[in-house]
Amino acid sequence: MSEPAAYIAPFRDLLPPNARLLVQAGAGDGGLARAYRKLYPASGLMVVEADPALAAQAREYADRVYQADLDSVSAAFYQQLAWADGWYFDATLEQCQQPGRVLQQVGQVMPVDTCIIARIANRSHWQAPETPPQHQWDLAGMLTLFAGSGLRVISGILLNPGPLPAEVEARLREQAGGDDSMLAALVEATQPSHYLIKAVPER
Amino acid sequence: MNPTPPFYCIAHAPFNWKMPDFMTMVGSGDYVPETGLAMSQLLSPEEALSNRYLGEYVALFEIRRRLIAEQAEGFVGFCHYRRFALTDPIGVLHQFNYHAHPDMLAKVRPEHFYGDGQTPIVPISVTWAGSVLQQYEACVTGRDLLMFFGDAIDCGVITNLEAANFLSGKAFIPAPTVAFIPVQWFVEIIHDLELVASRYYRHHYVYREGYADRSIAFCCERLQAFLLAKRIAAWGQDKVIQRPLVLLGDTYPNL
């Protein structure tokens, strides 16, 4: 995982300003929620988390916590959150069993001015995670996922926690075989640890 | 050039005169015109009746989606059943508008509605005694306009400075929907209005009695006027046909 300070600021800045209600899909350490609350103290945050222990932790920073699994809740669950100003997934979308279905259900209840922000691990990152998530995508796969869920990606940010190690860069150079544009494409694909994706309903 | 660009005429109730055949009638609320589009048939009952506070904008949001689905290009025109922006106005100029009897509509040729098909035709900008905000407050409730423009800033539709300058300025284009403009302008402007209206409804909408309940429509009109004026300025003020609106009424002169 990248350093919290490195991704929290751009993530927070992509979230809708001064939200009445934000929905956080999956519990985290609360760093992002606290950073957002510092800017917008009157905003409400609801966390949806299936794991009882993680849900209990989330109560430390969230106004409300639903212990529920987004993969299996009914359409009525999503409908009751139709008044949320935005949803965000902090490296949790790739942990859903059916991420496309979850996105689709959120997208169906979202008002037109709201958005989904997701920080998603890059499958092509040079360093494979110790515990791979349920799903792994490269950028093209992420864009396909959102488009297939009725959502339009309106912005994206590469999260680069640091430069490539020398040996990784040397390997990519070899792979590129002297082709500079291919080398640039390989570096661009493998350097980001995550992508920050902002999407809105396709309506 | 397409000889008959898409042209929509919006009405919320039946009326006693006939609009030109090239226009697509659009019925807002529960009004179902004999031909054309009826919001009550295209949308859910709740959505169609949201014209209570959104006015004609419910129909405009839907038309925008249709234009995108049709991959429409070029220009698109809009009028209300009794309000038009014409290249050659009819009737008698009274204050900021022309007043004309509905029978005079028979004298209006299609090209008076859409000109050469590639030049924007828009209502004139009207200057008021006070600021835009004061003029709004004099008619309804200033708080609504302030909140609406705050939401427009939060949605990224306008900047703080643009909002401050517009609300403290003394002029805007009334009935900015009534225009013949590039499809792209319409799609972009209506998209922005829908974002702001959606956020405003969730965050700041307050029910008001009677006519004043159309607060979101009134606020949309001001923001639309600003967004249209911005595009006119970029296009070139001298390359746009700006005319006083023509209003029809049974008691108006029949020349």
Where are these regions (language model features)?
Chain B
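ER/Golgi luminal nucleotide-sugar-dependent glycosyltransferases, focusing on the catalytic module
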Residues: M1-L255
